[in-house]
Amino acid sequence: DVYKRQAVGEVNVTTKMKEVGAVIGGEGNGGVIYPASHYGRDALVGIALFLSHLAHEGKKVSELRASYPAYFMAKNRVDLTPETDVDAILAKVKELYKNEEINDIDGVKIDFPDKWVHLRKSNTEPIIRVYSEAATPEAAEEIGQQIMKVIEDLAK
């Protein structure tokens, strides 16, 4: 297994990278961490690695992009009340989807065969952020909305 998950945040990612001896790391926001340069997000290193890969492959950007599958992301949120026990809701969601692949390193991520949903509570306001990804924008939005409905029902 060459892919390791870690909680969001540069310090969390770099700590895990050092622990496992990773040669590259990053976050969903596009931040690239390349220890051969330094243990910090660096946009220029990301650009240099991309250009180096293009040169090595001898391809145009469009050709390289066409060689990868397309995924679409939807970002939503469920607004709750300050009295809501967000941790209890996330635990219930985890139980409801126990037959799917679940990762709870940073919230609750549910991996379905052809899509995923990641639920993260806010540390500053009573909300759950709902990130979803699928092969079409509609499918990403649909699975996000389905899980949001589950959360809203649990919060009643």
Per-range role (PLM):
Residues 2-3:
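Short, small-residue-biased leader/transition segments that mark boundaries at the very start
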Residues 20-72:
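C-terminal catalytic subdomain
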Residues 7-11, 30:
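Short, acidic/turn-prone active-site loops that include or flank metal/cofactor-
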Residues 57-156:
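Catalytic-core signal marking the mid-to-C-terminal active-site face
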Residues 14, 44-52, 91-94, 148:
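Predominant activation on well-ordered alpha-helical scaffold segments within soluble catalytic domains
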Residues 10, 40-44, 136-144:
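Short, charged, low-complexity patches
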